[in-house]
Structure formats: C-alpha cells, structure tokens
UniProtKB/Swiss-Prot annotation:
Segments traversing the membrane: 388-408
Protein name, per record: Syndecan-3
PTM annotation: O-glycosylated within the Thr/Ser-rich region which could interact with lectin domains on other molecules.
Disulfide bonds: none
Tissue: Expressed in the nervous system, the adrenal gland, and the spleen.
Biased composition (Low complexity): 156-173, 225-238, 275-286
Positions bearing the site annotation: Cleavage of ectodomain: K383, E384
Gene: SDC3
Biased composition (Basic and acidic residues): 433-442
Ranges of Polar residues composition bias in the record: 288-299
Length: 442
C-alpha cells in the first residue's frame, strides 16, 4: 500500500486499520508507526499553513501593500508595495513541505533535467544549418552542369538564327555586342553577382523568359555560353540579341535607358527594325567581333551599370535624363560599325523631337530660366505694383512740399518781425565818473 498525500492521511489511516485487522496483530504493529508519522506530518503542515495564512502574514510597514483595495485573502497572493518581501516564495516553500513525503520530488528533478537534454538537440540543428549551406553550394554546381547542355541547344538555335535576327536587334545596342568578352569575367549586375546581368539578357534573347526567376540557371547559362563560343563574332551576335530585350539595367549601354524614359514604344521599334534589315545588320556584329577587347569593354561596363542602378528606381525625371545624355555620347564613341551609328541616331532624334515630353532637359532648362526671369517681369508688369509706386511717389511729393512750405513760413515770420529785433537800450543807471576828484584825507 502506497502512502497517500498528507490531506488524505485520515482515509489512508482508515484503510490501514482495515488492512491491519485482516492481516493480524503482527502486520498492525508494522503499519502503525509509519501511519502515525504521516498523520503527524500532515497535521503539522496543515497547521503551519493555516497559521501562516491567518496569523503570521508579514506586514510591510514601509510599503504601500496595505493601501490596496483588495481583501486580506487576496493580499497574500499580491506582491508587497516596496518589493522587500516575496511572500509567494514562502508559500511555495510551505507547499513543498507538504509534498515532501511524496515521491513526486524525484519526478520533479527528472523534468528539470529533461530541458537540458532537449537543449542539446536544439543546438544540433543550429550546427546542421552550416552543413546545409555547403549543400547549397554543391547544389549550384550540379545545376550548372545540368543546364550547360540545355543552353547549347538554345545557343545553337540562336547562333543559327541570331546572326540575322539578333544582330538586327544590335541596331539598338551595337556596344552590347562587345559584352561577350566580358561575360567570361562575369561582369556587372546590380545585386553584386556579376554574371547575372549578362545571363539574364541571354535568356531573354533566346525567348525562354521562364528561366529568368532562377538565378542558378542564369549562372549556368553564363558559364555555358562563354566556353562554347570559340569565335567572338558569334557570341557578339548572341549578346546583341540579348541586350535590346533586357530590363535596361543589365545592359551595359545607356541607350536602352534613354529608350524607356522618353517613351516605352521605342522597345517594340527595335525588334521591328531587327526583323526588317536581317542581312544588313548581320555584318554589324562581325565588325564588333573584330574589335572586342576585354579590358576596354570591362571599363565601359563598369561605368554603365553604376548609372542604371540610379536610373532604374529613379523617380526624378530631370536628373536621370541628364545621365542618359552623357552615356549616349560615351556609347557613340565606343560603338563600331555603321549599324552602331544608325542605332545611336534614333535615340538621339527622339529626345530632340520629344521636346513636348514633360521631363526632358530642354524643358527643365527653360523652366529654370523662366523661373529666374518671370518674377522680375511680373513685378514690373503687375498693375498693383505700378499703382503702389505711383501712390508712393505722390505721397512723398506731397510730404516734401509740406516740409518746404513750413520752412518758408518760418522764414517769412522772421522777416515780418514776429519778434522785434531792436537795439539794446542803455541801462537807466550808468556809472559816471565824477567831474571833480575829491580827495579826502583823514
């Protein structure tokens, strides 16, 4: 028979008495001592708790605990105002004394140890996280290997067709044809992953835009296209097809940037031109292939992606337009071949002819000059200002005339003799020398 809790000690004693009567006087003698100990322990614990609750409730003289509007029974559960006494801890100790004879104490120690054992496996997943990171890196490498054969198929189709179709689009970007030399170096992209820019352009030119959201596939495309292109002209043609269609941020030339800012219709105009002069634009990429130098093109690409970072999210129209005009001149200098000059002419003509556009440089300069000149003209032309000037002049003239009249009046008063300017009269009593000098001698 297991010893029950202290509050059930009476029932346990009754059960023990029944068992003792059944077992005999010998068993009764063995059971009575532990039962008596349990009864004494239970009564002592209950009496101590009752005494602590009713009589020995600590009073905090310095705190404001007694000022609360709670009854005395609830004040035992509340904290003291000054924080000097922790009565809940004392009550917890007393409850622990009640349950001290129970075996629950051993059980309570085991769950206290369990969280420590659980903490160790919690630490293991954090250790597994770095293990997952190396797994991601090899995951990218097999993707590159698997997608390399996929790109050649697209590459083969582009090399056969883009020598005319994609090279035709090079009219919009002849300088981008120079990018192939830099693709091997994994050149710029706004997210600081250099190969992404050129690779995104490659996917768009091939028409497979569904692969754009996967950065791993784009990395594979960049690596696959660069080794497979032994001849620079073919790669130049492929990249020419890729450059006109990109988001204008990945392209290394600023001409596509100038295209969307004046009007978005320029982008469809480029593919139309590409379809029309297929044979004429095909020699364009070959000429670009004759002049590819990786160092010079790296410099041009580094200069240009910095501008698209500011140009892509730019909300201001005036500043990005200034930037577009400067890179247009740079592109014209770098461009090689007649197709390049032809491509540079339409964007140049568009901003010139796009004077009606709201955000062009010409309009901005005119607005600034007008802002500086209009206020001056308006001040002189306003009737209110003229009336104010006239009235002020009249009032000033009247005031001056009034002052002059006052001065003249004062002068006239002096001349009329408002106060007499007479010669001073001799004093009535004057000192006269005696006629005779009389000397008196004492």
């Amino acid at each position: 028979m297991k010893p029950g809790p202290p509050h059930r000690a009476g029932a346990a004693h009754g059960a023990g008495a029944g068992a003792g009567a059944a077992a005999g006087p010998g068993a009764r003698g063995l059971l009575l001592p532990p039962l008596l100990l349990l009864l004494l322990a239970g009564r002592a614990a209950g009496a101590q708790r009752w005494r602590s609750e009713n009589f020995e409730r600590p009073v905090d003289l310095e705190g404001s605990g007694d000022d609360d509007s709670f009854p005395d029974d609830e004040l035992d559960d509340l904290y003291s105002g000054s924080g000097s006494g922790y009565f809940e801890q004392e009550s917890g100790i007393e409850t622990a004394m009640r349950f001290s004879p129970d075996v629950a104490l051993a059980v309570s120690t085991t769950p206290a140890v369990l969280p420590t054992t659980n903490i160790q496996p919690v630490g293991t997943p954090f250790e597994e996280l770095p293990s997952e990171r190396p797994t991601l890196e090899p995951a990218t490498s097999p993707l590159v290997v698997t997608e390399v054969p996929e790109e050649p198929s697209q590459r083969a189709t582009t090399v056969s067709t883009t020598m005319a179709t994609t090279a035709a689009t090079s009219t919009g970007d002849p300088t981008v044809a120079t990018v192939p030399a830099t693709v091997a170096t994994a050149t710029p992209s706004t997210p600081a992953a250099p190969p992404f820019t050129a690779t995104t352009a490659v996917i768009r030119t091939t028409g497979v835009r569904r692969l754009l959201p996967l950065p791993l596939t784009t990395v594979a495309t960049a690596r696959a296209t660069t080794p497979e292109a032994p001849s620079p002209p073919t790669t130049a043609a492929v990249l020419d097809t890729e450059a006109p269609t990109p988001r204008l941020v990945s392209t290394a030339t600023s001409r596509p940037r100038a295209l969307p800012r004046p009007a978005t219709t320029q982008e469809p105009d480029i593919p139309e031109r590409s379809t029309l002069p297929l044979g004429t634009t095909a020699p364009g990429p070959t000429e670009v292939a004759q002049t590819p130098t990786p160092e010079t093109f790296l410099t041009t690409i580094r200069d240009e992606p910095e501008v698209p970072v500011s140009g892509g999210p730019s909300g201001d129209f005036e500043l990005p337009e200034e930037e577009t005009t400067q890179p247009d001149t740079a592109n014209e200098v770098v461009a090689v071949g007649g197709a390049a000059a032809k491509a540079s002419s339409p964007p140049g003509t568009l901003p010139k002819g796009a004077r009606p556009g709201p955000g062009l440089l010409d309009n901005a300069i005119d607005s600034g000059s007008s802002a500086a000149q209009l206020p001056q003209k308006s001040i002189l032309e306003r009737k209110e200002v003229l009336v104010a000037v006239i009235v002020g002049g009249v009032v000033g003239a009247l005031f001056a005339a009034f002052l002059v009249t006052l001065l003249i009046y004062r002068m006239k008063k002096k001349d009329e003799g408002s106060y007499t300017l007479e010669e001073p009269k001799q004093a009535s009593v004057t000192y006269q020398k005696p006629d005779k000098q009389e000397e008196f001698y004492a």
